[in-house]
């Protein structure tokens, strides 16, 4: 019996008690199901807490144009957002997302602590945030060279 393998291009965890959503993305576009699930989770946290933060790590993958449009339509607030990526091209492109949210800042992996500063993660929560991000990263599908 063959098992179906489902790609995981975007994974996330909501830390409601810390008013934080941590997400990790590989270098591929998220599926619409992944994106819509993430968007619903963020919207739900926003409704519950009013103020929240986003920590995103990515290997260069990003939402499609249609997904960005859904984000823009649903964006009720402009949460402080830190995007961490080793891709210089991605960080340049992502900085243009400030038209959606002026509180977005991009950081290289070596600037991870600055990313946590940007979204006001307390010293006591930093280790937990790092562990969650590392665990999420392990859940991602590694895209093949043909993707």
Regions found by a protein language model. Name each.
Residues 2-147:
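Amphipathic, Lys/Arg-enriched alpha-helical "gate/interface" segment within cytosolic domains
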